[in-house]
Amino acid sequence: MSIERIKYPRTFHLPYSQSRTDDDKTLPDDSQFEGMNVVVTIKMDGENTTVYPDGYIHARSLDGHGYAWQNWLKSYVWKFCGSLMEGERLIGENLYAKHSIGYKFDSIEDSFQVFALICDGFFENWSDIEDFCLWNGLKHVEVIYKGIYDKDKIIQAFENKKKELAEQGQDIEGFVVRDENEFPTSEFQKHVAKFVRANHVQTDKHWRETWTKNEF
């Protein structure tokens, strides 16, 4: 039976996000998150990648075109893709290639960082992601805040992390807010949004033409 390949939804900017491109979409306000239990994670500067139970992977585009920086991941996914149920897919950031921000990882395996599990039209809750990563020896994107949505607390958590990384000579792109609980894919924009820091350089064309590896 063939498996349907599905593009990951577009993430809208929070209204207080500091950096946008011309084709980005922005929420009119953040009222949808009021009273919501959320998980806030670091927004990593990599390639959005979807993994299926049969080991097939694709980036945001569904054209199936492969690139050299995806080759290691195509082999690595066989370590865990068998743990995905029928109708389930795993989404993570492929950080093998350096984009605008360079990273240094303890191992090459850490350059794939999970941020979503989707099954039969629903984004699974955050604890399911943590469990899947624990059982399969995977790394998920770092959590900087968890609790009732509070803009001020979230921004403070981000600034604290930004300062911590700066002291280590590292940069940070921004953060992603998501509902801690399960929600339907059809309502993605009601449950997920992003913040990108000021002056984050968008260099997709450049990094592909002269790409280099991150450090492992």
Label each region the model flagged.
Residues 1-216:
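Core nucleotide-handling region used for phosphoryl-transfer chemistry
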